[in-house]
From Swiss-Prot:
One of its GO terms (molecular function) is ABC-type transporter activity. It comes from Aspergillus rugulosus. The lineage of its organism: Eukaryota, Fungi, Dikarya, Ascomycota, Pezizomycotina. ATP binds at residues 641-648, 1264-1271. This is ABC transporter ecdL. Its main location: membrane. GO terms for cellular component: plasma membrane.
Length: 1479
């Protein structure tokens, strides 16, 4: 006899498909046949099939675990009386699962996903079967077996879910990689980071490791290969490449999104079932139905939580991979760009603004197709509830979708216009930061400030049309939410009254309202995802156009990789040879197998040019014409010629960098090193700059350091050669930067060395020492038999060359040969330069002064130890700062409009209560809202069908119209008034801070960090903040109102509110401490990536010449991995918060339904209202989290801007705001009175007790060895240094009392490094528009530039990189100085980069046109200052000698010694020509 406590059910009932049993168990159970055929067999068959495939896959992988005993537990089989097939299949599947468990354990990092999903899914099904069997007569034994099976499965699930980090052979795996399906579903692996961030400050080292997919380690080769194939096949669709590479991650989001659709659309059925249940009287089945409804709500809402988290997780992973892949492609292509390519600077916008738009757009990629499915489902479900009336809602949706589709097409167009304007502003800003020293020196900060502000205003103006379209699209998305219920319910009610049908009652009304809530979410999701996708596609197209740009140069002769170390050639050096160590071995490049880039025979020539013509632009006049030359191995070749003759272009031609050439260029494949005119340095320490991509060899390193005369500089550095040099080595002297770049080229030990005017900026003695150490008979390069090509403007030391090439002004080779051949042929070169012996200059006196920058920055960034940056968390102060920026009045208008929208939406959709604080007139409004409109309407219909239909319907429509009006007003006010105002103010504050920062600040702060403020931070403030702000504000108000309605509709639920608020407070406190730090880290880790990118752009030619492209790719990838890591973990933090809040909503749903179905003391309409609001609450909570996290991110950018503007020092001090009288200085009298100066008040002085006087009209020369303080003296006069003691007077006025900008604008300065604005020739020559065109053209003609400028387009042509050679740029600066009227002229080595003819021209112009001005000139070429009135000799920041140069030259003076060494001056040209400019 059966002992079952439940009523018996006949087997004939259980043998039907059902699925619901009938006639027993209170009709609340499945039939046994349904359970076996649906709940048991399909999951078993699917799991077994997938298990076999997985076993086959795992067999080909390697073992990942340590050897250990493996306990395999076979799944117990079960039998039933109804299905032998179930027994057989279960029996067969059991060993398959055991086999799979073994292979998964040994060959997989994670616990078996298949087994975990199967066990987790079938345990509830088996429990249901066990319950059914227990209720069957005479089946207690089988039921007990099934109950045992359920227990065993639970045990197996626990065992299979156990992770195996401790058993792995390699412990370096990321936590996510080893996490099981349950761990990943609930993000348990992320909890340690949250705990760590809660307890302590996070740094990059403390972040969780992420897998190689996120770091783009796995996909980098594939995406490069596929893109190369696409370009080669002229099928360069970037979208297709991304789909092919990341298809797995893309498809990975489909399943969880489909599951999310399923559980979301179970909600209307549940609402309808609960409302119907509450409207029915209690029966014998009520208890079972109530329990089933509670369980169903638990399953659905927990399913929503897990599916949402899984979907977002997969989406974010895909987005991060795409982000990393695109940045890699952009960087790779940048490495191939021509040095003068204008797009290389534009690419900065691509990796900042465009990438962010792509990330933002692709995050909602799956919403596009999912929303369409949800819209279709919603309309179908709505049709089942309100029949033909659903057509009205469908028409509203259709109109919104069609208009949205049409408008979204314009979105990409106007976004590109905005981005182009942003690109111009960023390029000008980056150029300004890069030339800040020259800009400050010339007093052009105000001019540049206004110029960039105007570019910002133009950018904001360009963005307005885009913002208007954005507002229109967002409004359309809300239009369907507000108007669809009005049209649907209105149509239903009218038709019901006309046809005398059942009126609108609670069950269909609230289930329909639930469906329309989901419909509104779907339409909003589609429109927003469409907007994001359009923006992403527009940015992808911009990136694609950049990647397919035909701007790559010809292949360089250099072989990629580091220098070969084969073929060691021993050499020795005598101790009297400067800079050489006799213990060092010189490694010469092995003779590589010959490969030719062009046809022709090399014979003995390493480089052969035949009829070679070269130009930088295809349609322009050739820079080089008909060049024929052969350069043999091991030779030292000097290339000379006047400025603009094409010397730099010839060197670039040898390197394969000139894009347009004709003739034959034959170069043997050799490893090459290159030194550009502008020394290219990276923001690392001194040693790393010298090593580059080479390995450290102490002996060779020391030999190179001595040869470049750097060892004495190292001795004065706070940390020796481990001292940081700052961005571009900003406070290094020109000579020090040049020698550092030269040392890098020497250390690389390349077979071919190409030098472009590298001795410029060196004082005669230091220059001669380095020159002899390299090219003397026992010089470093001579001993190594290195082929060297040196371009210079100087004719000094020509006798030491093996071969000389003389270029004419038209770019033709007018003379060439050995010094002897040129001497015998009657060369135009000076005779004495051709007959000097090569050994006569080996006794150069070493320079012994302490470098001025070492003294100045002993305690600065050069010696700083990197520390973790402070974390500034966004707080209420940041929000208040933003509100103050836009204005409190504007803010309250925005809040009132948002509140009006929510109140109107409340009454139109009838799903919330307005809070008294929402607006004024509280009493009246509260009285009107005491009963909710739809609840009131449906209850009235239940009492009196169709009564006062017009009243209810008209107010319904009014509230809908008001809602959309308020929303449109809020959006327009935000986007067109608040955002532009904030954009202008924050940018202006940043720019003003940079312009007012002291010069030393730029040596302590990485340029990438500064640039990050102007790109990423402003991008967040401009774009992310407004979208997040309006979304967060509205979602917050809706959440509060929805919660109020839920409590109002279910009194018992009010008891949970204190606990809910406490829980939310704990969650946000726990979450915020970590997420805020992650947000700051995410922004901070971008700075090294951007800095590295900018350094790469600046050194493109050098990178390719050295063959270091791969090394820099690897370094870039390292920075990218760190940036990806922090960004991905920030996304994971947001997913964790969404999951947590969804689980809280699930518990609320369970509590609400449990109270409703068990107590049943509320009306069906009230509970329906509460359930609809619960759905809205969940959706709005997600919207709040999504927008709030984005808002916090943007507020983090504002916090960074605030910190930057408040913590950056300002060079303007108290008491120096006075302005000089107009026309000051009128005389030009300069007095230094015991001046001691330093870069700031905390660093070591660079000038000590300097006293001298320059009378009006006198010409003063400042001389001395490199680093002696010459530039510091001039900088102190220009107020770039801080005068700690003494005073500097100009025309009797202490300049420390005057505005720094006024002082600089009143003086006339020709800086060592020419700089130009991003504007026309006219704007650069006459920025204040004080000269006529005739005066400008006359000045240009005086300097021989009028014809050059005319050929390039005249005064109104825009200047860009490579517009003029460096020497021509220096002449253009001189023209600017002539046009500027000032009594004092400051010259900083203005003749160092020009040939003798141009030097004579400059000297004559200075004498004839500026004879009445007081002149202070820094000079290395002492022959140019012999007619000066006075000369000052500096050493270690002190005046060691002063007097008339002609008098001192005849005495046994320091000046006479320098003058004699000046006759031995090496090739002195200027060092600051950009790599792509031709000389």
């Amino acid at each position: 006899m059966d002992d079952s406590p439940w009523p018996q059910c006949d087997i004939r009932v259980q043998d039907t498909f059902g699925p619901q049993v009938s006639g027993c168990y209170e009709d609340f159970d499945f039939t046994l046949l349904f359970e076996e055929s649906i709940l048991y067999l399909p999951p078993l068959l699917i799991a077994a099939s997938v298990a076999l495939l997985r076993i086959w896959q795992l067999r080909s992988t390697e073992n990942l675990l340590k050897r250990s005993g493996l306990l395999s537990i076979l799944k117990p089989t079960s039998t039933t009386r109804l299905s032998n097939a179930a027994i057989a299949i279960g029996f067969v599947a059991s060993p398959i699962f055991a086999w799979l468990s073994f292979w998964e354990h040994a060959r997989s990092l994670r616990p078996s996903t298949i087994l975990n999903v199967y066990l987790l899914g079938t345990i509830p099904m088996d429990a249901a079967r066990a319950r059914t069997l227990f209720r069957m007569p005479g089946n207690s034994a089988i039921a007990s077996i099934f109950a045992t099976i359920v227990v065993c499965k639970v045990v197996l699930l626990v065992v299979e879910a156990m992770e195996k980090q401790r058993l792995l052979l390699d412990r370096g795996w990321a936590p996510e990689e080893t996490a099981g399906i349950l761990n990943r579903s609930f993000l348990w692996w992320f909890n340690p980071l949250l705990l760590s961030g809660y307890k302590q400050a996070l740094t990059v080292d403390k972040l969780l490791a992420v897998d190689e997919d996120i770091g783009v380690e796995k996909s980098k080769d594939e995406i490069r290969r596929r893109w190369a194939q696409a370009v080669k096949q002229n099928a360069s669709s970037l979208q297709d490449v991304l789909l092919a590479v990341y298809r797995t991650e893309l498809w990975g989001g489909f399943l969880p999104r489909l599951c999310l659709i399923g559980v979301n659309y179970a909600q209307p059925f549940l609402v309808n079932r609960v409302v119907t249940f509450l409207g029915q009287p209690d029966t014998s089945t009520s208890r079972g139905v109530a329990s089933g409804l509670i369980a169903a709500y638990a399953i659905v809402y927990m399913g929503i939580a897990v599916a949402t988290a899984a979907f977002h997780h997969r989406s974010y992973r895909m987005v991060m991979m795409v982000r990393g892949g695109l940045i890699l492609l952009i960087y790779d292509h940048t490495l191939t760009l021509n040095a003068l390519s204008p797009s290389k600077n534009d690419s900065y916008t691509l990796i900042t603004a465009d990438i962010e738009r792509i990330v933002s757009g692709l995050r909602s990629l799956h919403e596009t197709w999912a929303s369409l499915i949800e819209i279709a489902l919603s309309l179908w479900l709505l049709e089942t509830k309100i029949r033909v009336s659903a057509v009205a809602a469908a028409m509203v949706v259709l109109v919104c979708l069609l208009v949205s589709g049409a408008l979204s097409g314009l979105l990409g167009v106007h976004q590109n216009l905005w981005l182009e304007a942003m690109q111009k502003r960023l390029n000008a800003t980056l150029a300004t930061i890069g030339s800040i020293k020259g800009i400050k020196a010339t007093g052009r900060t105000n001019t540049l400030y206004e110029t960039i502000l105007q570019l910002r205003r133009t950018e904001i103006q360009k963005s307005l049309k885009f913002r208007e379209l954005l507002v229109a699209l967002v409004t359309l998305s809300y239009l369907s939410t507000t108007m669809a219920p009005t049209f649907a319910f209105g149509t239903y009610s009218i038709l019901a009254k006309i046809r005398n049908m059942t009126p609108l009652l609670a069950a269909p009304a609230f289930s329909s309202l639930t469906i329309m809530t989901l419909l509104g979410q779907a339409v909003s999701g589609f429109v927003e995802s469409l907007m994001g996708l359009r923006q992403a596609m527009a940015s992808l197209e911009r990136i694609r156009q950049y990647l397919v740009g035909k701007e790559a140069p010809e292949p360089s002769p250099n072989k990629p990789g580091v220098a070969s170390t084969e073929g060691l050639v021993a050499w020795s050096a005598s101790l009297d040879e400067p800079g050489l160590d006799p213990r060092v071995e010189m490694r010469r490049m092995s003779s590589l197998q010959h490969r030719f880039y062009n046809l022709g025979e090399l014979q003995d020539g390493l480089i052969v040019l035949q009829n070679h013509t070269a130009s930088w632009e295809k349609a322009s006049k050739p820079v080089l014409t008909d060049i024929n030359v052969t350069i043999t191995r091991g030779s030292f070749v000097i290339v000379i010629g006047p400025i603009g003759s094409g010397k730099s272009t010839l060197l670039h031609s040898i390197l394969g960098e000139v894009p347009h050439t004709t003739g034959i260029r034959t170069i043997q494949e050799v490893d090459t090193a290159f030194c550009a005119q502008t020394p290219w340095l990276t923001n690392t320490n001194v040693r790393d700059n010298i090593l580059g991509a080479s390995h450290f060899d102490p002996a060779w390193y020391n030999a190179v350091v001595k040869a470049c005369a750097l060892h004495r500089d190292f001795a004065q550095l706070p940390h020796g050669d481990r001292s940081m040099i700052g961005s571009k080595g900003i406070l290094l002297s020109g000579g020090q930067k040049g020698r550092l770049a030269l040392a890098r080229a020497l250390y690389a030990r390349k077979a071919l060395l190409v030098l472009d005017d590298v001795f410029a900026g060196l004082d005669p003695k230091t220059g001669q020492e380095v020159f002899t150490s390299l090219f003397g008979a026992r010089g470093l390069l001579r001993q190594g038999k290195t082929t060297t090509v040196l371009a210079t403007n100087s004719t000094q030391n020509l006798s030491m060359a093996d071969y000389i090439m003389v270029l004419g002004s038209e770019g033709r080779l007018i003379e060439q040969g050995t010094p002897t051949e040129l001497l015998n042929s009657g060369s135009s070169l000076r005779l004495e330069e051709l007959v000097k012996t090569r050994e006569g200059k080996s006794k150069a006196e070493p320079e012994r002064e302490r470098p001025e920058y070492a003294r100045a920055l002993r305690n600065s960034v050069l010696g700083a130890t990197p520390v973790a940056a402070r974390r500034r968390f966004s707080d209420m102060a940041i929000y208040k700062l933003y509100i103050r920026t836009i204005g409190w009045g504007s803010w309250w208008i925005f809040i009132v409009l948002c509140s009006g929208f929510v109140v109107a939406l409340t009454l139109s959709r009838e799903n919330t209560l307005a809070l008294p604080s929402a607006c004024a007139g509280v009493d009246l409004l509260t009285a009107c809202l005491e009963e909710i409109w739809l609840k009131f309407w449906t209850e009235a219909n239940a009492r009196n069908p169709h009564d006062r239909l017009g009243y209810y319907l008209s107010l319904f429509a009014v509230w809908s119209a008001l809602a959309i009006t308020f929303f449109l007003g809020a959006c327009l006010h935000l986007m067109l008034r608040m955002v532009p105002k904030a954009a202008k103010i924050f940018h202006g504050s940043l720019l003003q801070t940079v312009m007012r920062a002291p010069l030393v600040f730029f040596s302590k702060t990485d340029s990438g960090e500064i640039s990050n403020h102007f790109s990423q931070d402003l991008e967040l403030i401009d774009m992310e903040l407004p979208r997040a702000l309006i979304g967060a504000v509205i979602a917050l108000i809706l959440c509060i109102s929805a919660m109020a309605v839920i409590v109002y509709s279910s009194n018992y639920l009010a008891a949970t509110i204190p606990g809910l608020l406490g829980l939310l407070y704990l969650v946000q406190m726990f979450y915020l401490r970590t997420s805020q730090q992650l947000r700051v880290l995410e922004l901070e880790t971008r700075a090294p990536l951007l800095s590295h990118y900018m350094e790469t752009i600046q050194g493109l030619v050098s990178l390719r010449a050295f063959g270091w492209s791969k090394h820099f790719k690897d370094r870039h990838h390292g920075h990218l991995k760190v940036a990806q890591q922090s960004a991905y973990l920030l996304f994971c933090a947001q997913i964790w918060l969404t999951l947590t809040l969804d689980i809280i909503v699930a518990f609320l749903a369970i509590i609400l339904v449990s109270i409703a179905v068990t107590v049943k003391n509320s009306s069906a309409a009230s509970i329906g209202l509460a359930l609809v609001n619960l759905i809205a609450f969940g959706a709005n909570m997600k919207g709040l989290v999504y927008n709030w996290t984005a808002l916090e991110n943007a507020m983090g950018a504002i916090a960074r801007v605030r910190d930057f503007t408040t913590e950056t020092p300002c060079e303007i001090q108290v008491g120096e705001s006075h302005s000089p009288s107009p026309g000051w200085p009128q005389r030009g009298l300069i007095k230094f009175k015991s001046v001691t100066a330093s870069y700031d008040f905390t660093s070591h002085p660079v000038l000590n007790d300097v006293t001298f006087t320059v009378q009006p009209g006198e010409k003063l020369a400042i001389c001395g060895r490199t680093g002696c303080g010459k530039s510091s003296l001039v900088s102190s006069l220009l107020r770039l240094l801080e005068v700690r003691n003494g005073a500097i007077e100009v025309d009797g006025i202490d300049i420390s009392t005057l505005s720094r900008e006024d002082v600089r604008m009143s003086l006339n300065v020709l800086p060592q490094e020419p700089f130009f604005y991003h504007g026309t020739i006219r704007q650069n020559l006459d920025p204040n528009c004080l000269s006529s065109d005739e005066e400008i053209l006359e000045t240009l003609a005086l300097l021989g530039l009028r014809e050059v400028i005319s050929k390039k387009g005249g005064l109104d042509v825009a200047m860009d990189d490579g517009f003029l050679s460096h020497g021509q740029q220096q002449l253009l600066c001189l023209a600017r100085a002539i046009l500027k009227k000032s009594r004092i002229l400051i010259l900083d080595e203005v003749t160092s980069s020009v040939d003798q003819e141009t030097e004579t021209l400059i000297t004559r112009v200075l004498r004839d046109r500026l004879q009445d001005q007081t002149v202070i000139s820094i000079a290395h070429r002492l022959n140019t200052i012999m007619d000066y009135d006075k000369v000052i000799i500096l050493d270690k920041g002190c005046i060691v000698e002063q007097g008339n140069p002609q008098v001192l030259a005849l005495q046994r003076s320091i000046f006479a010694s320098l003058l004699r060494s000046g006759d031995e001056e090496p090739g002195n040209g200027h060092k600051h020509e950009s790599e792509g400019e031709e000389e």
